[in-house]
Amino acid sequence: MTKSELIEILARRQAHLKSDDVDLAVKSLLEMMGQALSDGDRIEIRGFGSFSLHYRPPRLGRNPKTGESVALPGKHVPHFKPGKELRERVSSVVPVDMSDTTD
């Protein structure tokens, strides 16, 4: 699901709200979450999960074109840990066998 699809679905489900208001709410929420993470804060949404930053230490990488070793600096990356309710909901989904698909 894309952000546009999410906005469209929410606008349909909340018919009393204007589509522009739903668009603004979703974009504001995502902006605030991004800002909180960039400030080093943790975001916890009970039943859904939590967003935090994990530190990746410096490491030695490799340039795929030349095979040359390259020093990569340490960095913080966003991390999502699903909550219990979300994990249980997702685990009940029957997995799709991708080997049966034909193009």
Swiss-Prot record:
Keywords: DNA recombination, DNA-binding, Transcription, Transcription regulation, Translation regulation. SMART domains: BHL. GO terms for biological process: DNA recombination; regulation of DNA-templated transcription; regulation of translation. InterPro entries: Hist_DNA-bd, Histone-like_DNA-bd_CS, IHF-like_DNA-bd_dom_sf, IHF_beta. Belongs to the bacterial histone-like protein family. This protein is one of the two subunits of integration host factor, a specific DNA-binding protein that functions in genetic recombination as well as in transcriptional and translational control. This is Integration host factor subunit beta. The lineage of its organism: Bacteria, Pseudomonadati, Pseudomonadota, Gammaproteobacteria, Lysobacterales. The gene is ihfB.
